[in-house]
Every structure is written in structure tokens, then in C-alpha cells.
A protein has these predicted regions:
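Coiled-coil-like amphipathic alpha-helices with heptad-repeat character
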Residues: 3-5, 19, 42, 58
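Sec/Tat signal peptide C-region and signal peptidase I cleavage site
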Residues: 21-27
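Bacterial N-terminal signal peptides
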Residues: 12-20
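Beta-rich carbohydrate-recognition modules and glycan-binding surfaces
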Residues: 27-225
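Bacterial N-terminal signal peptides that target proteins for export
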Residues: 2-12
Length: 225
């Protein structure tokens, strides 16, 4: 009987230890941006903006809308993706990005250290998150894009690992004029999750293979969960 109680005690202790380990591994969701500040800067304090290469182009602005039953300020991304002209006659590129990494920063000199080294850039440790989530809708419902994610390696190269087309991660199977929450598992991106640099909305040329495409999408509540 005593041996049985000891075995039960060890089992309960192991389960408690396992539960505690799981609790440490699962990080609380982090809201990267809710777009309510009206600034081209996310809630992490890092830069956000469009990226463009002519002849393609993109711009962002803010709009009032109702998302999931709540009034909210949302991000509008307007794009015009061309399929010819520019480098390699590929039509250039365009999209929107927001930084997850904190950029390098200067350090104020002191009497003791008049020439301090700058603080290095700090990549986000996303290894305890499981997915990227955000709310999205299209202006007409015929829009399309992929999500790009960068770690330190891809950040240095200046490119990203891409998701599948956004419809794969939406309840309706495609963008519509209604708000839907996209849920993109991080394991869709084969990279170093402990050194995340940025996340991007990318309008790829092969999404619109015939003539390119111009349109508008709206985003809200971009998060890591």
C-alpha cells in the first residue's frame, strides 16, 4: 500500500510539473497593432509602412468601421500590383509590413562613457506562439494576398517566407466584403521563430496571373497567439 501511494505521489508530482512547464511555454497573446493610434507605428513601438517597387504601388490610411460587433479604427491598404515593367519585367512588388524586431538605438554619452556603443537590434522571440491572427475584409471581395514572415536570416536577405493564399486561413475560404478572422499557424513558415523580424501583407504577381490587380483590403487587430 505504501509503495502504491508513493507511485501515485510521483505521478501527481510529474503531472503538476508538466502542467507548470506547459504554462510557461504558452505565452499570452501579444497585440502587435490595433491601428487605433492613427500612427504608422505598431503597439510594440516599431515602424510600419508600405513597401513598393515601381511600377507597382501601395498606400495605407485609416478608416472607421465595425469589426466583430465593435466600432474600431482599421487599416486600409490600397494596392496596384502590375505584372510587367520594372526589374526583370515582373511588374515590381508592393505590400505592407510591420516590424516585430526593435531597431538598433543610440545610447546617450556619459562622463564615464563618452562614446557608448549603440544598442543592437533586438529580434522578437516568437517561439512560444502558435499562430498569427488578424481581422480582414476586402472592398469588393475579389482581392487576394499572402502573408510574409521574416526571421533574422530572411531579414538580412531582404525577403520573406510566404504563407499560402489568404483564403486558406479564412472561414469563407476567400476574402469577402464581410470581416473574417484569419488564423495562420506559425509552422506554415519554416524559419527561426526565436528571432522574428517582421510580418508583411504581400500582393504577389502570381496571385493575379492575367493582368495584375488593383484593390483595397482592411485589417484590424494583428496579433501573435
Amino acid at each position: 500500500m505504501r509503495e502504491k501511494r508513493c507511485w501515485k505521489g510521483r505521478l501527481i508530482g510529474a503531472l503538476a510539473l508538466s502542467a507548470g512547464w506547459a504554462a510557461r511555454v504558452q505565452a499570452a497573446p501579444v497585440l502587435v497593432d490595433d491601428f487605433n493610434t492613427g500612427e504608422i507605428k505598431n503597439l510594440l513601438g516599431n515602424r510600419s509602412n508600405v513597401f513598393i517597387k515601381a511600377p507597382s504601388k501601395a498606400m495605407v490610411s485609416f478608416r472607421e468601421d465595425t469589426v466583430n460587433g465593435k466600432k474600431s479604427q482599421v487599416l486600409m491598404v490600397r494596392y496596384d500590383k502590375r505584372n510587367s515593367g520594372g526589374p526583370f519585367d515582373s511588374g515590381g512588388w508592393c505590400g505592407y509590413y510591420t516590424l516585430l524586431k526593435s531597431p538598433a538605438a543610440l545610447v546617450a554619452p556619459t562622463e564615464e562613457n563618452p562614446n557608448p556603443d549603440p544598442l543592437p537590434e533586438q529580434y522578437m522571440d516568437g517561439s512560444r506562439y502558435k499562430m498569427i491572427t488578424f481581422w480582414v475584409r476586402g472592398e469588393k471581395g475579389d482581392e487576394n494576398f499572402v502573408v510574409g514572415l521574416l526571421d533574422r536570416h530572411w531579414d538580412k536577405i531582404g525577403d520573406s517566407v510566404k504563407s499560402e493564399e489568404i483564403g486558406k486561413y479564412l472561414p469563407a475560404g476567400k476574402l469577402t466584403t464581410d470581416w473574417q478572422q484569419a488564423k495562420i499557424p506559425l509552422d506554415e513558415f519554416f524559419l527561426d521563430y526565436s528571432q522574428l523580424a517582421s510580418v508583411a501583407i504581400v500582393f504577389e504577381g502570381d496571385l493575379f496571373p492575367e493582368t495584375g490587380h488593383a484593390g483595397m483590403i482592411y485589417l484590424d487587430d494583428l496579433a501573435l497567439e
